[in-house]
Amino acid sequence: MQQATELKKQLQSIHRKSYPAYKSLKGSYQFGHYILSIDHVQGDPFASPSHISVHISRKDAGFPDAYSKNNLTCITLADHLTRQFEQQINHYSFRSKGSGKSGLISVSHCGQEILSRTACEITSKGITARFFIGFPANGRTINAPELEKILFDFLPACVENTFFYKNINQEELEQTIFLAEDQQAIREQLKEKKLVAFVADGAILPRESGISSRPMKHSVPFISPESLRITMNLPHKGKIIGMGIPQGITLIVGGGYHGKSTLLNALELGVYNHIAGDGREYVITDNTALKLRSEDGRSIKDVDISLFINDLPNKKNTHCFSTADASGSTSQAAGIIEGMEAGSKVFLLDEDTSATNFMVRDTFMQEIISREKEPITPFLERAQKLYTIAGISTLLVAGSSGAFFHIADTIIQMDCYRPVDITRKVKEICGKYPLSPAKVPAFVMPDSHRIIQKNTPVIHSHGHGTGKPDRLKIKVHGKAGFLLGRQEVDLRYVEQLIDPEQTAALGLLLKYALEHLADGKKTIPEIVDYLQKQIHTKGLIAFADGSYLPCGYAIPRIQEIYSCFNRYRQ
């Protein structure tokens, strides 16, 4: 490792040279109490910026051991430091001038949820922060003094004010850690109390707009109905009161615009911890919960959907069903089976985004179209056994059909944004209109031995010889999906993906699986289990192409890993 003085000399020696001379700077340099690494140098000033990292030893950083005692506190601390670092570098970004991206200093932008990102990682050795710098140039000629200003003036100030405990707002960090530990305590108590979710009194559920996840100002705070009100005991905040949603089948009903979908949206994102001031800090959902919807046109490969669909007129085998263009009902059936495979114990559904013929068939329709002519066993007839046999609870928003009233264990009416427990009232009415007994096919747990086929790279021969295989390249399209090689992976309807960096990580994982794990024998669960173990022990660096991992990735849940793999068109 070289000293910072060597970097300064090297910089001065390449001033006004052609831009590729910047590549000679690649390496690690000792800057007092931290190490600066130039991991990748951009090809020209208009290309993606250079990849930089800094490492501060645990001793020099000086953070209390309690803040990195487990995975929860490490992720929370890293998230907090990333937010602080972004605030610091925003003061200096583009203050060094030049062409293209000259002077850019950027890091991951964190939203309302707390994610494990490669932008900052806490290990037993210390803190590693990763970010981007646009190396300055005039045209395509190196402007060394401007980069010197960034590396020797701007960056040291940002690092000192972010990654050293003595220099930060210690009380603010303590409250951040305490909040995370309180949130974790609620998650643990959900299981003890046989709940699928908790919504604290005073929570602010509505968001600012359709393109903002910030809380809406002047909105109605959440108040729990007395019959569902419970108390959670938290290690730092003490007692907190709110609505506990029991395991089983819960129906959320109400008039239009009364807050049904707003509550469901808060619950679907309750699988993540939220930052202080978000309004949903204490909206906590079972972390395996999966939002499901119909998804016309998606790809399905070898999924046993026979629990819901059988005896298709084209004689297609629904025990191992495949299609490149799923209907609404088959896509939703596949989503449920795939969710079971991913270990989800709670399904979240909204009537508005579900396939009607998949969810319910009323008595009139059953009289007109006999069961022998209908291949679909509706979700209505499977929801109870999903809970009693498979242990999977359902939260369903309904606004037009009362079909689920008979089977629901808990019924919540949203009335002017306030929840009301109407279970007893509805059950009394249901008693006047008993359900006719239906001949429902036996509930048989689906079978799964699905595999991902081995990747066959495209071979290009240039002139003579056999040519070399193309490596799979990833192009991320925000949260919506990514292009892997020539194959588009569409994730638009995977609604619990909240950050493009999660999508980027999914591309990385799928690429690795296709290149190193898929052999035509390993099942998807076997592959995902291997990936999960690697993430737990090594992090995403285990799947990087080179010797370093850049900023720009966030670890997704196992449910989203399955969702991604299931949407890859083999």
Regions found by a protein language model. Give the residues of each.
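Conserved P-loop NTPase nucleotide-binding/switch module
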Residues: M340-A383, Y387, S400-H406, T410-K427
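Glycine-rich phosphate-binding P-loop
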Residues: I240-Y272
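N-terminal pre-Walker A segment at the start of P-loop NTPase domains
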Residues: P206-I241, A276, I284-A289, R293-I300, ...
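Conserved NTP phosphate-binding and transfer environment spanning the P-loop NTPase/kinase superfamily
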Residues: T388-G391, V397-Q570
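Phosphate-binding/switch loop-helix module in NTP-utilizing enzymes
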Residues: C320-S354
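N-terminal accessory targeting/assembly segments
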Residues: M1-A185, Q189-K194, L205
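Carboxylate/His-rich catalytic cores and anion/metal-binding grooves
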Residues: K193-L195, D201, Y257, L264-E295, ...
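Flexible beta-alpha connector loops of hexameric P-loop NTPases
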Residues: R298, F308-S329, R361-I376
